[in-house]
């Protein structure tokens, strides 16, 4: 990530959501990074696990955890903590996609997470995240001066399509200032 090219001023904190501020992407002619690039640039754990961003939009985020022996559990499949991180990262990607335009006035924070492990996971696993409320509902609450909360639902699947885990993460948009 490059720093701002504008006139010197007080140092800016780095990381999410500051990555989204104007001036953090170099000259105006350069394009903003996509949602997956933002996630990987601001969440070091996602890079540590070598998570792959398959799709990341305001409607859906799909991330993949490759089969890596360094992150296996005692039965040779992905560790529960790695699968949790995969799901949480997918939820973060959809939050960036849906609410990235609100980051100048609110900070997204995960406030609660629940996971259920349904079947044995082996090999590559994929997390698919979807919003549990519409963006319009959440932004309307923010506009009204509230601190909205909204669920993100995540399904974790094996390559054969079997659901190995389900998560719900409650996020909030904490108003700044």
Segments from the language model and where they lie:
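HotDog/MaoC-like acyl-thioester-processing domains
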Residues: 121-122, 132-177
């Amino acid at each position: 990530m490059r720093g701002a090219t504008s006139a010197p001023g007080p140092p800016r904190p780095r990381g999410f959501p500051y990555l989204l501020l104007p001036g953090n992407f170099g000259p105006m002619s350069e394009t903003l990074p996509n949602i997956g690039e933002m996630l990987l640039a601001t969440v070091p754990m996602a890079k540590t696990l070598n998570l792959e961003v398959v799709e990341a939009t305001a409607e859906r985020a799909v991330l993949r955890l490759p089969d890596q022996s360094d992150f296996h559990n005692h039965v040779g499949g992905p560790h529960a903590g790695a699968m949790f991180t995969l799901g949480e990262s997918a939820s973060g990607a959809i939050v960036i996609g849906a609410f990235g335009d609100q980051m100048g006035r609110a900070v997204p924070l995960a406030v609660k997470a629940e996971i259920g492990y349904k079947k044995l996971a082996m090999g590559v696993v994929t997390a698919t995240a979807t919003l549990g409320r519409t963006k319009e509902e959440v932004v309307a609450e923010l506009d009204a001066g509230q601190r909205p909360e909204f669920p993100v639902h995540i399904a974790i699947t094996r390559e054969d399509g079997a659901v190995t885990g389900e998560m719900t993460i409650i996020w909030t948009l904490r108003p700044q200032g």
